[in-house]
């Protein structure tokens, strides 16, 4: 994941900052507790594709 990309993309739900979870290959929105998948290195920033995460998961 190119960290320059993280500087310009935002959560499609709240427009907040996204955090990269390399282990799970997901982009995390800590405000909405959502995890957006990466497929073949491409972020899938669709609310319908996101999974809900616990507050503990969003802290890591």
From Swiss-Prot:
GO cellular component, one term: cytosol
Domain of life the protein comes from: Bacteria
SUPFAM superfamilies in alphabetical order: Trm112p-like
Alphabetical list of Gene3D superfamilies matching this protein: 2.20.25.10
Similarity comment: family membership: Belongs to the UPF0434 family.
PANTHER family (alphabetical): PROTEIN PREY, MITOCHONDRIAL (PTHR33505:SF4), ZGC:162634 (PTHR33505)
Protein name in the entry: UPF0434 protein CKO_02153
């Amino acid at each position: 994941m190119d960290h320059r990309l993280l500087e310009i993309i935002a959560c499609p739900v709240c427009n907040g900052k996204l955090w990269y979870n390399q282990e799970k290959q997901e982009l995390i929105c800590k405000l909405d507790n959502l995890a957006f998948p990466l497929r073949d290195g491409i972020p899938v920033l669709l609310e319908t594709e996101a999974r809900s995460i616990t507050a503990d998961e969003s802290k890591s």
